[in-house]
């Protein structure tokens, strides 16, 4: 992936690590295989991608690294999977450590922590939950919105807006931060 990007563009100025898998499961139902798969993608993949791209950014003394974490990694009680929450907590910790170590190379590292976001996967999960609870999808959407202080789930564009800002010159002195985009679910 990095070689391909370098071949096509000549350099990498911005890395957006957006990796995430999960499985809706109670903590007592998670298996070692679940844990390993979730951490392999969500934490290990982000780490090694960050490391590889940082090697390209260091000689140029410039770069922006933006990791997509989750409010689950900050202890949001609505999280449905402990392995997922732990993996996203690892991404938040990685962001802070990488920011400290890469600052001397003028590389900014931040993370975005989305809350409930409308995606094909989340909407499929909403339909499954509605069916399991014997209610309409519309009722599940109302329930979901009711717990969010701004009364709406994110659209992907809400996350993208924060990413664009963090990649912009306006964020040149921001590093080591994890920004919630969650409608106020877990204020920091």
PLM region descriptions:
Residues 55, 100-101, 172:
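Alpha-helical segment proximal to the catalytic Tyr-Lys
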Residues 70:
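Residue(s) in the substrate-gating loop at a strand-loop-helix junction
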Residues 75, 152, 163-164, 175-188:
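Short C-terminal tail/terminal secondary-structure segment
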Residues 26-27, 34-36, 65, 144:
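Substrate-binding pocket helix/loop in short-chain dehydrogenase/reductase
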Residues 50, 87, 95:
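Active-site helix of classical SDR
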Residues 30, 76-85, 97:
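Active-site loop-to-helix junction immediately N-terminal to the catalytic Tyr of the SDR YXXXK motif
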Residues 103, 108, 174-176:
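Short, small/polar-rich loop/turn modules that mediate ligand/substrate recognition or access, typified
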């Amino acid at each position: 992936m990095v070689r391909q990007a370098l071949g096509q563009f000549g350099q990498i100025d911005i890395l957006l690590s957006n990796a995430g898998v999960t499985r809706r499961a109670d903590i007592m139902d998670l298996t070692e295989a679940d844990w390993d798969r979730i951490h392999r993608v969500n934490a290990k993949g982000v780490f090694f991608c960050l490391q590889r791209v940082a090697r390209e950014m260091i000689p140029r003394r410039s770069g922006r690294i933006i990791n997509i974490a989750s409010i689950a990694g900050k202890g949001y009680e609505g999280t449905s999977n402990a392995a997922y929450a732990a993996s996203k907590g690892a991404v938040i910790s990685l962001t802070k450590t990488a920011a400290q170590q890469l600052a001397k190379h003028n590389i900014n590292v931040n993370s975005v922590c989305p809350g409930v976001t409308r995606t094909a996967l989340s909407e499929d999960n909403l339909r499954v939950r509605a069916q399991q609870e014997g209610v309409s999808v519309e009722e599940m959407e109302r329930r979901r919105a009711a717990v969010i202080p701004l009364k709406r789930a994110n659209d992907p564009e809400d996350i993208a807006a924060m990413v664009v800002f963090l990649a912009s010159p306006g964020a040149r002195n921001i590093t080591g931060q994890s920004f919630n985009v969650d409608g106020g679910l877990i204020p920091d």
